[in-house]
A protein has these predicted regions:
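PRPP-associated nucleotide enzymes
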Residues: 1-198
C-alpha cells in the first residue's frame, strides 16, 4: 500500500532511504516493487532522563532538537551527553548496516525517507535534514503507520508526508510493524536486508 502511494505521488528517479532499523525492510521492498534505488540512513534518538525523546541525529548531521524542550543550565551537560551517546550509537549502527560504505549519491534526486511506525518525528526530521545536506533535490517522508501528532509536526516542518495509516492514539498502532516480543529479531532481519539490497 505504501509503495503504491509513493508510486502515485512521486516521479522517478527515486532513492528510498530506510531509517534503521524499523524502516529498512519496508523501504527495501517498496524500492524493489518500484524499481527505485535503496539505501539505509542511520539515525538515533536523543533521550534525556526525565524528559524522554527530545530529538535525534542522522548520520553525521547536526542534532535536531524539539523546540519545546528548553533545557535549564544544569541540564546542558545531560543534553550534551545524550547527543554524544546518540552519535556513538549512529557510528556503531552504521558499521552493522552499511559496513565502511558511504550512503549512495543523492545528487538532485527525489529522496524518500521511510520508517515503519512513527510515534516521534525526530529521526525522520534529522534524516530529512541529512538528505538535504547530501544534495537531495526533493525530500519526502513516508511511513507505514504514523500518529496524527507526528503527521502534524512533519507538516509544520514543511516535509511532504506519505502514510496510508494515521492513528489518533499518541502511543501509535496497537500492533506496530516488527516483533515487539523480540526487537532483536527485527533488527537482525533489517541488517540482513540492508546488506543484501545495497
Amino acid at each position: 500500500m505504501l509503495g503504491r502511494q509513493l508510486y502515485q505521488r512521486l516521479s522517478p528517479p527515486l532513492v528510498l532511504l530506510g531509517i534503521t532499523p524499523t524502516g529498512v525492510e519496508i523501504a527495501a521492498h517498496a524500492a524493489q516493487s518500484m524499481t527505485a534505488s535503496f539505501d539505509v540512513i542511520v539515525g538515533a534518538h536523543v533521550r534525556v532522563e526525565g524528559h524522554g525523546i527530545i530529538g535525534a541525529i542522522a548520520e553525521d548531521g547536526d542534532a535536531v532538537i524539539d523546540t519545546h524542550f528548553e533545557p535549564t543550565f544544569d541540564l546542558m551537560d545531560a543534553l550534551n551527553a545524550a547527543i554524544d551517546k546518540a552519535r556513538r550509537a549512529v557510528k556503531s549502527e552504521r558499521l552493522l548496516f552499511r559496513g565502511q560504505r558511504q550512503i549512495r549519491s543523492l545528487g538532485e534526486r527525489t529522496v524518500v525517507i521511510v520508517d515503519g511506525h512513527l510515534v516521534a518525528p525526530w529521526k525522520m526530521l534529522a534524516s530529512a535534514s541529512t538528505a538535504r545536506e547530501l544534495g537531495a533535490g526533493r525530500v519526502a517522508a513516508a511511513a507505514a503507520v504514523s500518529t496524527q501528532a507526528v503527521k502534524e509536526q512533519l507538516s509544520v516542518h514543511k516535509l511532504e508526508f506519505i502514510c496510508p495509516s494515521v492513528v489518533l492514539d499518541p502511543e501509535g498502532h496497537a500492533h506496530p510493524f516488527g516483533d515487539p516480543q523480540d526487537p532483536s529479531a527485527e533488527r537482525l532481519r533489517s541488517i540482513v536486508v540492508a546488506r543484501e539490497a545495497a
